[in-house]
């Protein structure tokens, strides 16, 4: 590799660096050698990541060589080098004037970026260099943990708590193997990223999370996300020592926002209520254990400890603190216009002091909260959601992050913090509450609107100064969009002696930039608030897009100011037919809101652009979104970028308003207005930086070329043009006529395609791991499955999506219990005409059962098969071949392959590996119980994956099919199509028979035989009528969903939530009296609700059914003979349970080990244990729980907080 000497340091570079790259590396070395901070801006595509790595590692190697030479000189006591001066051993040591002792430990390099995907790209660049340092990548347990039990935890903090428990008790064998295998050569040598760590950890059976932490001690360069550095809690959790280190923030335009967000919080009524519910649950459990003396039996969870080591009085005090905090927030008077009130930052200490949360008590409170979270770690179910408690812990740590000096009051600290913080209290709106609802208590009826407590930091200097105070040697901030550098440095409030604003490395014929103020119809293009949704603007923008798509080759990127603007535009274009015109030119791909679907969509876009038969593709995204940050759209993937407007922050958002006020106050207080940003300047800068990030997608390397379209008339203003990158402004041109835009762009691309070298052919770029790239091999027609699904606009745009009839509303609590039941689709099959049609009809009929099971989970697969048939003229062609290379999509093997693709898309890589291992084990051992246990963990907990469990029916062997269908119905409420009384066919005479015989027998579970099918039945479920009421199940809908829907209609949302909560509790504790008490209280108030009590029998477990029958007879005044009263539900040997109840719950527990004695239960016994219920019987009154004498009685009442 070429070598270049810069500032006395020899740098190995993969190629001869360009002048701007040499200048960039010179500035980096200047920062390192002088031990000063630097802000370095270099346009995207100039190779700043490569320059950063090569220059810093070259300096580190140079320093290491210098120190080694000095140590050799000392060892020989100066005999060999007595005449040499210190400066001759290297400028790095001499220039700084440090003694030899300062370099005993070579400074570590900490390289931080926004996301792990960006860090993966950086590590990929590192592998292309000549340097081979010791590398460490830090990640979270969510990314690195491979322990099955820990991975199943729903939240990150629960994973942390359970992991710590297992590590402390030495019960995690993956952790135990780390120390033994850490020093093995194959792990210490290579450069590992996150995916490599997980692969090696799984292979070596050791924990990747703690492996990376051990590697950190010996690493030369450590990679981590921003928040690990900027958040004091994360620094402490990962034991990051910054003293003497070199810290590099890549993509540093996000640092300001991350600094402010890491020091801010929003406390909602839901968070307080969640914490109170958990504390109340623990309080009741501890009181019960204290009374019964059964502490050891009730609370041992995976450890040898005796349980929660807290007194009842301490738990009660903790509950009282949260109640007082809630009361203090509610006591704040708000104006009647829902705007909220703003107070200085020091007010947070006054508010918390009312709840007895102070500098003196914070330690005890944090310790108590941590004990409860650790105690509940590993439990499952909705009532162990400790997210609220974890958030309270984080809030207390943020507020009291700076301890006052000894002997001084905490009020002095509060006065100092008030300059950077504001407290904002505002009412919680119903739409926010519905949008964030994810747990049982969030839908509890509230008569009084709750209030949100916000504590916002408006100065990034708060976190940055704290970072520098840790002893950082050099801090380097770099990005492609930092200008203006002076204002950026002022916001950080730390010195940056070294600054650089680099030009680009491209020539004039590689970039075209045009401001397009009007569309083809002459209508002014604007994304201003009053015009963005007007039909004239939307229509003109759509016409402009369709015209630009005609002249821009290959990939075209379109960036909108926000998701609502993009979705509204797409909705309008769909109605007006404009989207269809663009689709005909370049298929549309839409950036999804959720992170999980993004990799699928972007990979499909890459594949579409790379297809030789296509004209490219159009990718619709949003500024500040995932596509605008760090993704590679080089060469054909991004020949054009359209920016449809200026993405200003929401002007009326309280946080934006307060930020602008804060900057104006700071500017007035400083007295030097020209040196500080005003609020309006910051507001404009936020929009321009987002635009500049989007623009940076088009030019990614020296020989790349592309066009930039700024489609908003406000880009023509002088202040907006001045905010554009310096390397873009020389190419800028304002067009008054849209026709001239098309003319010039067409000419630009004609010249560029003739003069610029052809891009080097590369593999299809992917944003996911290598294991997930295998999905692209499952192409079923001219486009892959992922491409088909990604091109479905209604999948990613909610406004275009039709809501299925009969599904519960998104906010209903029963939806979380039932899951999402997809409706069955029935299509009338036409009578086959002709021989070919008859053959195709027979094949489709033979595989109807498996295809139905698969099709309900992946609608895109049905579309795929239909489109494939349409492209072939609506009739399947039959070709006789001897050795087909891969199965056809219509065969059994083809459907199996489609199912595996769907499973791999739905599961993570680790879970998919578990799935394949379960398949292999079932094939070799025929162990059906082990198979069901594995499938239950993978598919039963998430309602969205229920149809995948149903689709697995095609792989089940004949003698297990009926048993599998019963289990599937119990877990999901869906049947697989098994027909009792009909023998499963052992072979099929279909067109795919020859194909199946050629397949590798290892792909089949039935000893190499074809997959067996079962024909679906359309008769539906048998209904059971009784004297009380009769319920007829609707075809294709589970009985559970019908019942909960009827409860919701009859009793209301609050009562339905109460019933589902009791049902979940019954699932866990098997306490029939408790659940019947709730159901009876809800359904016996009115005679017309009594059938709901009788129908509840579908949930009652088998050993409880006689007792439940007797109870129903007593409550409804019916005869007590079992012949006269029957329970509704399936008449099988297994109890009917809601879909969320897993297969493990069907196994006998401690309370189910033997059949209970038959007792005569009265309604009074049900209410005796429910002091919080208001329903009373004629012959009894509720009795409160017996408490220890010293415990306040009112604290044992269940808290009904505002939600």
Swiss-Prot record:
Locus of motif DEAH box: 250-253
Cellular component terms per the entry's GO annotation: chromosome, telomeric region; nuclear membrane; nuclear speck; nucleus
Residue numbers spanned by region Disordered: 998-1020, 1120-1203
UniProt subcellular location: Nucleus
Helicase ATP-binding domain ranges (all copies): 7-296
Binding site for ATP: 42-49
PROSITE patterns linked to this entry: HELICASE_ATP_BIND_2
Keywords of the record: 4Fe-4S, ATP-binding, DNA damage, DNA repair, DNA-binding, Helicase, Hydrolase, Iron, Iron-sulfur, Isomerase, Metal-binding, Nucleotide-binding, Nucleus
Family, as annotated: Belongs to the helicase family. RAD3/XPD subfamily.
Leftover remarks: Able to elongate M.spretus telomeres in crosses between M.musculus and M.spretus.
Name by which UniProt lists this protein: Regulator of telomere elongation helicase 1
Organism: Mus musculus
């Amino acid at each position: 590799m070429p070598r270049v000497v810069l500032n006395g340091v020899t740098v190995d570079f993969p190629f001869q660096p360009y002048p701007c790259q040499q200048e960039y590396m010179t500035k980096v070395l200047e920062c390192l050698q002088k031990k000063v901070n630097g802000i370095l801006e270099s346009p995207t595509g100039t190779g700043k990541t490569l320059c950063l790595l090569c220059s810093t590692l070259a300096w580190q190697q140079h320093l290491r060589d210098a120190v080694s030479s000095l140590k050799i000189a000392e060892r020989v006591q100066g005999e060999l080098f007595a005449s040499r001066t210190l400066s001759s051993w290297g400028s790095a040591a001499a220039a700084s004037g440090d003694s030899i002792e300062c370099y005993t430990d070579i400074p570590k390099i900490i390289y931080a970026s926004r996301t792990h995907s960006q860090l993966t790209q950086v590590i990929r660049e590192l592998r292309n260099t000549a340097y081979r340092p010791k590398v460490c990548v830090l990640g979270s347990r969510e990314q690195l943990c491979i322990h099955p039990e820990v991975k199943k935890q729903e939240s990150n903090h629960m994973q942390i708590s359970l992991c710590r428990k297992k590590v402390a008790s030495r019960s995690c064998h993956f952790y135990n193997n780390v120390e033994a295998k850490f020093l093995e050569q194959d792990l210490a040598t290579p450069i590992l990223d996150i995916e490599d760590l997980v692969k090696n950890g799984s292979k070596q059976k050791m924990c990747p999370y703690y492996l990376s932490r051990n590697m950190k001690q010996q690493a030369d360069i450590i990679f981590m996300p921003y928040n690990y550095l900027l958040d004091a809690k994360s620094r402490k959790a990962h034991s990051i020592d910054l003293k003497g280190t070199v810290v590099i923030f890549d993509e540093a335009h996000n640092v300001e926002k991350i600094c402010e967000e890491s020091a801010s919080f929003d406390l909602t009524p839901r968070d307080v209520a969640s914490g109170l519910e958990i504390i109340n649950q623990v309080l009741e459990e501890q009181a019960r254990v204290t009374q019964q003396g059964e502490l050891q039996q009730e609370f041992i969870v995976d450890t040898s400890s005796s349980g929660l080591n807290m007194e009842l009085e301490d738990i009660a005090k903790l509950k009282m603190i949260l109640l007082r905090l809630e009361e203090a927030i509610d006591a704040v008077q708000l104006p009647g216009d829902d705007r909220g009130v703003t107070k200085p930052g020091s007010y947070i200490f006054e508010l918390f002091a009312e709840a007895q949360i102070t500098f003196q008590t914070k330690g005890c409170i944090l310790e108590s909260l941590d004990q409860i979270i650790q105690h509940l770690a590993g439990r499952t179910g909705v009532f162990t959601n400790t997210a609220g408690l974890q958030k309270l812990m984080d809030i207390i740590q943020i507020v009291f992050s700076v301890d006052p000096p000894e002997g001084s009051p905490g009020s002095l600290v509060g006065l100092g913090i008030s300059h950077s913080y504001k407290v904002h209290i505002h009412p919680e709106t119903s739409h926010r509450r519905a949008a964030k609802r994810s747990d049982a208590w969030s839908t509890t009826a509230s008569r009084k609107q709750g209030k949100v407590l916000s504590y916002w930091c408006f100065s990034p200097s708060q976190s940055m100064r704290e970072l520098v105070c840790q002893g950082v040697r050099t801090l380097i901030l770099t990005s492609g969009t930092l200008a203006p550098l002076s204002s950026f440095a002022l916001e950080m409030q730390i010195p940056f002696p070294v600054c650089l604003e680099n030009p680009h490395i491209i020539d004039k014929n590689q970039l075209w930039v045009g401001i397009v103020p009007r569309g083809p119809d002459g209508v002014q293009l604007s994304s201003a608030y009053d015009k963005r949704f007007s039909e004239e603007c939307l229509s003109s923008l759509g016409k402009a897009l369709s015209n630009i798509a005609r002249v821009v080759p290959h990939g075209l990127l379109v960036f909108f100011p926000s998701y609502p603007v993009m979705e509204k535009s797409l909705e309008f274009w769909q109605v007006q037919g404009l989207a269809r015109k663009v689709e005909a030119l370049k298929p549309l791909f839409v950036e999804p809101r959720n992170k999980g679907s993004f990799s699928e969509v972007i990979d499909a876009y890459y594949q579409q652009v790379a297809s030789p038969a296509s004209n490219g593709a159009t990718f619709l995204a949003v500024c500040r979104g995932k596509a605008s940050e760090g993704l590679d759209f080089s060469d054909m993937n991004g020949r054009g970028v359209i920016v449809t407007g200026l993405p200003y922050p929401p002007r009326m958002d309280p946080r934006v308003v307060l930020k602008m006020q804060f900057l104006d106050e700071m500017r007035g207080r400083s007295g030097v207005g020209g040196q500080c940003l005003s609020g309006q300047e910051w507001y404009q800068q936020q929009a321009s930086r987002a635009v500049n990030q989007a623009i940076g997608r088009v030019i990614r390397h020296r020989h790349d070329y592309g066009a930039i379209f700024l489609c908003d008339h406000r880009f023509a203003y002088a202040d907006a043009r001045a905010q554009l990158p310096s390397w873009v402004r020389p190419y800028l041109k304002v067009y008054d006529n849209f026709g001239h835009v098309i003319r010039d762009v067409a000419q630009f691309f004609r010249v560029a395609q003739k003069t610029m070298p052809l891009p080097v052919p590369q593999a299809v770029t992917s944003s996911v791991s290598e294991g997930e790239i295998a999905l692209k091999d499952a192409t079923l027609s001219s486009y892959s499955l992922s491409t088909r699904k990604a091109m479905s606009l209604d999948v990613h745009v909610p406004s275009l999506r039709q809501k299925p009839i009969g599904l519960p509303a998104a906010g209903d609590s029963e939806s979380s219990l039932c899951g999402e039941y997809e409706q069955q689709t029935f299509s009338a099959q036409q009578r086959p005409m002709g021989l070919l049609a008859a053959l195709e009809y027979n094949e489709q009929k033979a595989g109807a059962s498996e295809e139905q099971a698969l099709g309900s989970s992946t609608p895109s697969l049905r579309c795929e098969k239909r489109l494939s048939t349409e492209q072939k003229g609506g009739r399947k062609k039959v070709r006789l071949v001897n050795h087909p290379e891969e199965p056809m999509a219509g065969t059994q093997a083809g459907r199996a392959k489609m199912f595996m693709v769907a499973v791999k898309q739905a599961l993570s890589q680790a879970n998919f590996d578990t799935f394949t291992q379960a398949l292999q084990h079932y094939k070799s051992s025929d162990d059906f119980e082990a198979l069901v246990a594995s499938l239950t963990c993978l598919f039963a907990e998430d309602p969205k994956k229920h149809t995948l469990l149903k689709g697995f029916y095609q792989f089940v062997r004949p003698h297990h099919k009926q048993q599998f269908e019963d289990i599937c119905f119990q877990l999901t409420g869906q049947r697989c199509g098994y027909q009792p009384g009909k023998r499963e066919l052992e072979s099929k005479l279909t067109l795919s028979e020859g194909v199946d015989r050629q397949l590798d027998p290892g792909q089949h579970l039935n000893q190499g035989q074809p997959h067996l099918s079962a024909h679906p039945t359309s008769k539906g479920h048998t209904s059971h009528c009784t004297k009380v009421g009769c319920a007829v199940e609707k075809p294709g809908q589970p009985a559970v969903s019908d019942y909960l829907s009827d409860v919701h209609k009859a009793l209301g949302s609050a009562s339905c939530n109460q019933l589902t909560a009791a049902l979940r509790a019954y699932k866990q504790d098997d306490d029939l009296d408790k659940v019947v008490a709730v159901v009876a209280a809800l359904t016996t108030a009115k005679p017309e609700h009594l059938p709901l009590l009788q129908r509840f029998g579908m949930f009652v477990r088998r050993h409880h059914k006689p007792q439940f029958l007797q109870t129903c007879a007593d409550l409804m005044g019916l005869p007590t003979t079992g012949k006269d009263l029957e329970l509704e539900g399936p008449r099988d040997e297994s109890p009917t349970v809601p879909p969320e109840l897993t297969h493990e719950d069907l196994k006998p527990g401690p309370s189910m080990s033997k059949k209970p004695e038959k007792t005569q239960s009265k309604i009074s016994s049900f209410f005796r244990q429910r002091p919080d219920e208001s329903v009373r019987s004629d012959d009894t009154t509720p009795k409160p729980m017996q408490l220890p004498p010293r415990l306040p009685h009112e604290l044992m009442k269940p808290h009904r907080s505002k939600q």
